């Protein structure tokens, strides 16, 4: 089953650009279509592969950035 996931990463500090750029770089290493806009990043792919890969990227981001919010919409 194909899905689209819209992600918005919100680091809760003044230096927010670096964590966002690192998050997007990690998403680009996945074997999925990545589309960016000023507010969010959308990824498209097969549900099982996308969600298992995305889980690791999210975990790394939370470990590297102690104060961060991630908004995720699955369509």
For each feature predicted by the language model, list its residue ranges.
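Charge-rich, low-complexity N-terminal segments
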Residues: 1-75
């Amino acid at each position: 089953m194909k899905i689209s996931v819209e992600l918005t990463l919100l680091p809760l500090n003044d230096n927010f650009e670096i964590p966002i750029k690192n998050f997007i770089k990690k998403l680009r290493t996945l074997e999925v279509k990545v589309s960016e806009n000023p507010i969010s990043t959308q990824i498209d792919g097969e549900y099982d592969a996308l969600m298992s890969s995305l889980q690791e990227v999210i975990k790394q981001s939370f470990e590297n950035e102690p104060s961060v919010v991630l908004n995720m919409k699955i369509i």
